[in-house]
Amino acid sequence: MSNEDVAEDVSQVTDFHFHTCRKFRLFSSKSDGYSQNEINIRNRVATSSQLGVTFVTVNSNQLSCFHTKSLLGYKITRENMNVEVTDLPIKTIRLHGVVLINDMGVNSDGTVLGVLHTKNNDVSVDVFDIKKICTSSSIEPFKPLCTTRVGTEQINQGSCLEWNPAFPDTFAASSTDRSILVAKINVQSPANQKLVGIGKFGAVTTAISWSPKGKQLTIGDSLGKIVQLKPELEVVRSQHGPENKPNYGRITGLCWLATTEWLVSLENGTDQDAYLMRCKKDKPTEWIQFHELSYSSSKWPLPPQLFPATQLLVDWNVVIVGNSKTSEISTVGKRDDWQTWVPVEGESIYLPTTSSGKDTVPIGVAVDRSMTDEVLLNPDGSQRHRPSPLVLCLTNDGILTAHHIISTFAAHIPCQMSSQNLAINDLKKLQFDSQKPISAPPSDQTPVTKPSTVFGQKPEAETLKSSLVGSPSSVQTPKPSSSLFNPKSIASNIETSQLTESKPSTPAAPSSQPKIASTPKSEAIPKISDKTLEHKKAELIATKKQVLIERMDKINDSMAGAKDATMKLSFAVGKVKTTIMECADVVRASLGDSKEVMDELKNLILSIERMSDRTQHTVKEMDFEIDEKMELVAGVEDGNQVLEKLRNMSETEKLMRFNKLETAADLLNGKYEECSDLIKKLRMSLSEKESLRKQAILSPLRLSSNLNQLRSGSETELALKVMRNVSKIIMDTREQIQRTELEFVRFQRDVKFQNFKKGKENLNFTQPLEMSSLDGDAPQGKSLTDAESIKVRQALVNQIQKRGIVKTRNVIVESYKKSENSAAMKNDLLDTSNLSNAILKLSMTPRRVMPSSSLFSASPSTPSTKSDAATQADEPPIVKTVVVTVESPAKPIASAPAVSSPLIKLNTTTATTTMTTPKVTVPKEEANKTQDQKPIISTPASSSIFSSGSLFGTKTQTPLVSKEESTLTTGVPSLINSSLSISPQEIEKASSKVETLNKTEEVKDEKSENEVTPDLKSEEPKSLETKVKEEPKPAVQTPVKEEETGSNIQKTPSFSFNSTTTPKSTSSTSSIFGGGLKTQTPSSSNSTNIFGARTTTTATPTPASNTSSIFGGGSKAASSPFGSFGQAGCQPAKTSNPATSTASVTFSFNTGATSASAKPAGFGSFGAGASAKPSSVFGGSVTAPTVPNVDDGMEDDSMANGGGSGGFMSGLGNARTSNTSGGNNPFAPKTSTGTSASSSSWLFGGGGNQQQQQQQKPSFSFNTAGSSAQQASAPATGTSSVFGGAPKFGSQPAFGAKPFGGGANAGLSKNASIFGGATSSTTNNPATGGFAQFASGQKTSSLFGGGATPQTNTSIFGGGANTTPAPTSSVFGGGASANANKPTSFTSWR
């Protein structure tokens, strides 16, 4: 065969061939064919290389064994190479209980023999010890070590058996009832068997093959499917036969070659086709046909079967394959790929023919590796080869052939093993010479043939019977047609042989008598005696008896055959039944599929109908449009001309016109962009001019900021909107203040006429009354003219400027958002609708420039004694509700705030509750001789605009002052915050009461240390007149005595629109809206603010300061009807460290926050003391987190690290304590990250807490001076915001974390927002400029949130913090990042 003729699956090899040895006859020729029982035997040859023993199935229930090496004892020559060896010594084995052998095999270590057999439809696997079989006597049947039953059906037969190639104690077996099992045996303890897996599949298993490593197994079934299984019979995957050949039947052979490759043969009619199946993961299965193995040339009625011998698979990648349809043994090997190897011509394995010249086919193949002698390649021994494996092939003619494998391939290393010299007892040589005299003496059987003709016997039966009589060896080899189920036939044959052998002369005598009597017929009759007749009768009876016995044997055989036929018929019926059931299932499945197809077709038809309807509708619409356009075209007279021109126009001209149009469009687009740029520039110029115009009424110090330029018109517009809103609020507030001042004068006059004064010791207000500090100054008449009103106002202004004390009035404001259930709410007492107008008018009123005041002053200053009188407007009074609240500085004090209910019920959209009136304790005024030498001590009292508690009914309790406090702070009255002026002598009594209460308080739990139940007592208020020093005198700073702690008292710098600053003085600074603060310096001076309020502040040991807001009172607020709306945070555990006290008044929509320790506060132009903790414009305070100096890009708007919560109008003031400094939510409370606290709050949220070593932060609040010393105490909870807190409508608010939020958390954008973000990770690189400064956490000062140190790089709404200004900074943003590439502006909103 040339190379061109070789297919891809065939490889011609020269280094691999076979050397043939002698051939041996093991049983007689099956010239009359095979019985069905013998056909069902799957493999008839098995060898044990470890023991050097080979087993051959010579009959359906009989085995023969012999030494494998004995095959090489017969030398081959040219003369005897075609001569059969008939005297091979073998041992005949009868197995106990075995009737029909189906399959057999030797395990991997060659110690046991497994036989799959069937007996009375019971299929079982018997495991025999090979050594016992060889060494025991053959007289008694051999008993197995253990027996394992396979299948449970009534009609069952063994199918196949396969030992695990890696684990010698494991085998798999199957039967025709679709059962399969995997068992594990124990040779030392045969009773201990283990069924690894047992199951029943959908088809009969016809082939089993283990993987080379023995980890898994593959089975092939009668439906042509290959299934990969685990030993527990768990299905790994399944594969059907080739898709292009759907008519294949059962699997006739299977061999697992490699991990993803199998040798598979499938039944194709009466033939079979062999394939290489390659199954790789995530790839289609490949099928490569082996044409050499698919070739069929046999005419024998044997079923198609493949016999793969895998003894060399692991070592050589070689499989010796026998095919029951061809007489050639093939080799499948792998070098580059799996192929069929074809050796040189004449060196392959060709099975011998029969005596009649008919080809034979293999019925068993095995490979033995126990040969240790060199192979003689020629008779003289001149050519030798190393010891090599021996291939054993058993033909259907009973011939066993042996062939040496001669391989010179370098990869084929020697794989021989030394076998044990196991002795086999009862070896006997075969004798097949008796076959020749069987046909020699037919004359001896002549008398026997006569009665046989009488009973219709055939000559063939006589020939068989003669062989039985003449040769005793025929008894040892039963007839092939003998019944399996009737052993009596064997016994009858034995009896017949014994009967004939006992009288050997009896057949000879009657045979001679007829010959003698046949010649002289006449003489022979009278000479016959009676004795002779009797002898003849006895002989005839014996002959008849023998014929009867033979007839009985035939009847037994026919009955056995009928029984077998019946069993086959039952099995066939079962198969037919199974097939019918399968067909029924297929029909059902087809019906189901048909229904599904019909449903799909119906759906498609419906879809097509819908589409047709839509198409018709579309066509109608198109027709309508076409009609309209045709009408339009018909109205054009020159339409045809235009169409003709368009048709006549060439493609080039069309393209040119299109290019011109495109160019014109591009030019137009460019012009549009230019116009857009010019419009932007124009807007920027307009915004700059607007900014310059507004700066005319602002403080000159604002002009010094280099951060007052905006980048774009959008930023300018947004910032102007914010400014207008803030200004509107300020104007409304100023207007209300003006009205309430005039109301105050008239109300004071009424108080005098009604003689409304009472004692000053214990004040308890049940009506909204106010103690006047301007007693006797108001006009006496009830009706005033315009001139008198102007005089009264001037006198009031002079008094206020001199004394610096202004009472807080209540302002009517409407809620910015009306309640949904306003009709159902009760106690509509308040309205905040005019607040925005008041603040706007207040901000737009020109203010007088203070000569020496510093907007960002951090040093002590001496304010001027003059203030702007523009706020005292001559307008009729509106509010008749006056609230006096006494607010705790930081630690609780003995006196509780007096809360009054309004006299009139105002129209409001927010329901409120009636407030109870806590006790206000005012000590009597006593003479103090040392008053001139000591600073004025006042009780700190700050009130919200409406009440000391929450706007919506939250009761407040003033905290107690610890016993370590040495001094108290006098009240800080203002137009917003009214307080009672108390002399130092009165404070001493208050202090004694406080100490008594504190002693009782210490016994309680720490959680309730800061709570006290006020003693409610109603008394009419008496007016108190505050003693004001006309001239400032030098005063020595009184140090605070400390017994337990040694914390230093920090001085609180002041900041206000006030008069000239005098260094080294005790300055009383007032903010625009009232109270100021006083710091201890070597000298003293007095100052009043624009509205005439003067305050004094002394260092008092306070753990934290309290803050009240418009919509929330001080600390320890009880729950209100509106939940946490306006609820203040709880006071933490008090500490003993002293701090500077501050009466803080916040103009905010958030409750006041209390903390465990305080920081020095900065100062804003609208509030003296600002929080060291920064706060957002609309939310809580912000702690600058440590984030990288880069922008992380777009982040999720949800709360990061749980630092803050909620969004705009979500939660409504729900305070939340967090371990992290949330900076995302501008409306949420900020948690304390250190041990200090502040009392500032933002416009819409309270101030938070700050770490002890952090720098001061800007604040945007309307509060008085509020500052306290640093204290190492437990961290305080953050404040809650009216418009912050927990999310009400989701965790990602519409106005949530980023747009108005504070400093971002770690990982978020560093320059996140104009109103938040712009945080700095280090104190040396703080954020600057814009609203971003409100949450930057730096020492900045701005118009709405001051700092302790004046900075140069500041803007109107946020100051710098000792940083170099960013090149791109604006009035409301920018310049917040040290990285110039990451500026902060309005465009940073996300």
From Swiss-Prot:
UniProt keyword terms in alphabetical order: Membrane, mRNA transport, Nuclear pore complex, Nucleus, Protein transport, Repeat, Translocation, Transport
Per-repeat ranges for Sequence: 1073-1074, 1091-1092, 1111-1112, 1122-1123, 1125-1126, 1163-1164, 1166-1167, 1178-1179, 1244-1245, 1283-1284, 1289-1290, 1295-1296, 1300-1301, 1315-1316, 1344-1345, 1357-1358, 1372-1373
Keyword Repeat: yes
Subcellular location: Nucleus, Nuclear pore complex; Nucleus membrane
SUPFAM superfamilies: Nucleoporin domain (SSF117289)
Region ranges (Disordered): 434-530, 851-874, 985-1118, 1183-1280, 1342-1390
Membrane topology reported for the UniProt record: Peripheral membrane protein
Record's compositionally biased regions (Gly residues): 1201-1210
Record field: compositional bias (Basic and acidic residues): 986-1033
Cross-referenced PANTHER family: NUCLEAR PORE COMPLEX PROTEIN NUP, NUCLEAR PORE COMPLEX PROTEIN NUP214
Annotated protein name in UniProt: Nuclear pore complex protein 14
Lineage of the species this protein comes from: Eukaryota, Metazoa, Ecdysozoa, Nematoda, Chromadorea
Name of the gene this protein is made from: npp-14
